Design a protein with these regions (language model features):
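Rossmann-fold cofactor-recognition segment
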Residues: 59-77
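C-terminal helical subdomain
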Residues: 197, 204-248
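Conserved NAD(P)H cofactor-binding loop of Rossmann-fold oxidoreductase domains
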Residues: 100-108
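Catalytic loop of short-chain dehydrogenase/reductase
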Residues: 103-104, 114-120, 141, 145-183, ...
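Hydrophobic positions on the long internal alpha-helix
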Residues: 83, 98, 135-139, 143, ...
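Conserved glycine-rich cofactor-binding loop
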Residues: 15
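Conserved glycine-rich Rossmann-like NAD(P)H-binding loop of the short-chain dehydrogenase/reductase
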Residues: 29-52
Length: 248
């Protein structure tokens, strides 16, 4: 069960830069299922329990703000379903799905530099498009479908972490990565139309490079902003000259 009135968040890529920042900033606000491939976020999890040796019965704040870590390789068959089942078994429901896990392979020499770029296409689209689709679909099938009123009451939604490169051309060999994120943006719009039928919103977040151009904390805050709003089918841009602006 969730803790009190806190929302339940299923977060992928929890051990990365953004996932870690989100857990650090919002572990006290959300019950977070932190999905990691290898490295867990740097916050207390169900694997730790803190005790004051001078007062063993004292309440320790870190014990109330723990994340529930799940190690999974979402590229392997059946792992998405396992993660969804674990999240629902632990908390009964999920209010917010954050598809943050991503694959990035840049090719500064261009797409014609041998076969290395072509060989990366399948994995880019598998991780950046197919896995978010599968997670959202399985969660809808196993929890959200036919629960329109409850979904609207809880303002349930999906946030897909995309990239500003999905709509702009940057140097550095981002052609395949950017194309996969552009596909994620359009997938977001289609899912918003379909999931709206049972009261679930779907949006995407398109940050510039973090933390070098935009602070990671700003991007994490933008996820929470989308969670709190009522908008659906939109891409929220997070750039240095505009902390968060809507983009169609």
């Amino acid at each position: 069960m969730s803790t009190g009135d806190r929302r339940v968040c299923l977060l992928t890529g929890a051990g990365g830069t953004l996932g870690d920042a989100f857990c650090r900033a919002y572990a006290a606000s959300y019950d977070i299922v932190a999905v990691c491939r290898r490295r867990a976020p740097g916050v207390p999890s169900q694997h730790e329990w803190f005790v004051d040796p001078l007062d063993p019965d004292a309440a320790i704040p870190d014990n109330e703000a723990r994340v529930f870590v799940v190690y999974a390789d979402l590229e392997k068959q059946g792992e998405v379903e396992r993660v969804v089942d674990i999240a629902l078994a632990r908390f009964d429901d999920v209010d917010l799905l954050v598809n943050n896990a991503a694959y990035t392979f840049l090719h500064p020499q261009g797409v014609v530099d041998g076969d290395v770029v072509l060989d990366s296409v399948e994995r880019h689209f598998a991780v950046n498009v197919a896995i978010p689709l599968r997670l959202a679909t399985r969660l809808a099938q196993r929890s959200w479908l036919h629960r329109d009123l409850r979904n609207r009451e809880r303002n349930r939604n999906v946030v897909n972490v995309s990239s500003l490169s999905a709509s702009r051309v940057y140097p550095g060999g981002q052609a395949v990565y950017a194309s996969s994120k552009a596909a994620l943006n359009h997938l977001t719009r289609h899912l918003a139309a379909e999931f709206g039928e049972f009261g679930v919103r779907v949006n995407a977040l398109a940050p510039n490079t973090f933390p070098s151009i935009v602070s990671t904390e700003t991007v994490a805050d933008a996820i929470v902003r989308l969670d709190a709003e009522s908008v659906t089918g939109r891409v929220l841009v997070v750039d240095a000259d505009a902390a968060a602006e809507a983009a169609s």
